[in-house]
Amino acid sequence: MTQINNRSVWFVIGTQHLYGVETLRQVERHGQQVVDSLNRSGILPFRLQIRPLVKTPDEALALCREANYDSECYGIMTWLHTFSPAKMWIGGLSVLHKPLLQFHTQFNAEIPWDSMDMDFMNLNQTAHGGREFGFIGARMRLPHQVVTGHWQDERTLLRIGQWMRTAAALQAGRQLKVARFGDNMREVAVTEGDKVAAQIQFGYSVNGWGVGDLVEVINQVKDGDVNALVDEYESRYVFSAAAAVGGAKRQNVLDAARIELGIGRFLDDEGCRAFTTNFQTLHGMTQLPGLAVQRLMQQGYGFAGEGDWKTAALLHICKVMAGDLTGGTSFMEDYTYHFAPDNDLVLGSHMLEVCPSIASEARPLLDVQPLGIGGKADPARLIFAAKAGRAVNASVIDMGDRFRLLVNVLDAVEPPRALPKLPVARALWHAQPSLATASEAWILGGGAHHTVFSQALTVDDLRLYGEMLGIEVVVIDEQTTLHGLRDALRWNEAYYRLNQR
């Protein structure tokens, strides 16, 4: 596996001067060996960077302050090789704003039965040193994570990698700018929300631009750039007769390419990595952005329709979290049900905007078809079906006094029959634990009709993300019952009201 970028997680070993110079040298050597091994493993998405031993309160404070201001640092991973009195960490942990992982490991995998002496016991104290550090985390109510396991165990490294990706997603959210072209779809409730509260909680900023500002950039795109992009389309997609050279709708494909280039340039100029559109506010645009949005999502941009900035932001964050993992991640909407004995299904889609990262076809179909809403020219779009396999749907909603993240476990399936007259991309799935329970639980929890659909991420990924942020997480999976979910929602309501700051 290739590491994603040059950013890193700091590997910090806590100890104290009590043990003497030679013991501390051994700790340093062990730490370097562990870091080198983990970096060579091919499992971690980001590099571990070893830092000097932390032996005093001043060193702990200085380290945490430095981590906060280092934009290349995703978070801190601590290891208590020896006993590190936790009071010395209070100052540093009080100011730390980066994610914290306690790696509860030890240098030796097994007890050296024949050779273990008091020198060995003096050096290898993770088992109780980690508990001391863990107490101060609990006492300070720190939203931190703990991974236990030997540093040469692949299962342990996979969990560290999961934490790293989530830490990267957290930082991406804190740096994210979301552009809204137009406002929300009129009279829709769930796409509304407190953007100031969201920026305080998640870190991302949401601002609006008039569609005219975007149209001006689109109109400045040169024909040569459009033709070059259409050549790329030709190499990647199968064209319908209408969309092909000489086809009745060829100009619509050229217009879609111009829109893609214009939106991409606008977002890059403004530093935005997520955006929303609204089919009710398209003044000056030739067609509703379909193909353009699909391709921009595949490039990592977050998107949601009808002004839904929460889902657009969540999509970009999830794409960062998915990183190098297998499987795609897309904007999605539950569209229609298939009620059948022992085979209830949900068809998910949207008007046009489903990301081709989830496509089962190597070369999706590029077509131009009429669209009954928006009042514009027939839009270009990619048509495909999602791959079969385990997936999740996720939604962030504004509950007024807090944000709630809902996650439903799904099993995507291959369509049992063709859909020859449906000219949009789609996914078909079994909702866990059943369509009836999943939909009722989702509705009781207030989940949005827009979601992020991911075949790369799991419930554990999203739960970890919610825990890092300190937001409410509601999971609907194979174990969910309606009475249990109702109880959990009531308990959560009490907890978050009592825990308001």
UniProtKB/Swiss-Prot annotation:
Q: Which InterPro entries does the annotation name?
A: Ara_Isoase_C, AraA_central, AraA_N, AraA_N_sf, Fuc/Ara_isomerase_C, Fucose_isomerase_N/cen_sf, Lara_isomerase
Q: How does it assemble?
A: Homohexamer.
Looking up HAMAP family in the UniProt record yields:
Arabinose_Isome
Query: Per the database entry, which stretches of residues form a coiled coil?
Result: none
> From the UniProt record, which GO molecular function terms apply?
L-arabinose isomerase activity; manganese ion binding
Q: Which reaction is this enzyme known to catalyze?
A: beta-L-arabinopyranose = L-ribulose
E.C. designation(s):
5.3.1.4
The record's keywords, sorted A to Z, are: Arabinose catabolism, Carbohydrate metabolism, Isomerase, Manganese, Metal-binding
Which pathway is this protein engaged in?
A: Carbohydrate degradation; L-arabinose degradation via L-ribulose; D-xylulose 5-phosphate from L-arabinose (bacterial route): step 1/3
Give one Pfam hit by family name.
Answer: AraA_central
Q: What is this protein called?
A: L-arabinose isomerase
Gene of origin?
Answer: araA
Q: According to its UniProt record, which cofactors does this protein need?
A: Mn(2+)
Q: Where does Mn(2+) bind?
A: 306, 333, 350, 450
Q: Which GO terms describe its biological process?
A: L-arabinose catabolic process to xylulose 5-phosphate
Cofactor: record remark: Binds 1 Mn(2+) ion per subunit.
Q: Which family does it belong to?
A: Belongs to the arabinose isomerase family.
Against Gene3D superfamilies, the record matches this protein to: 3.40.50.10940
Record function comment: Catalyzes the conversion of L-arabinose to L-ribulose.
Q: Which GO terms describe its cellular component?
A: cytosol
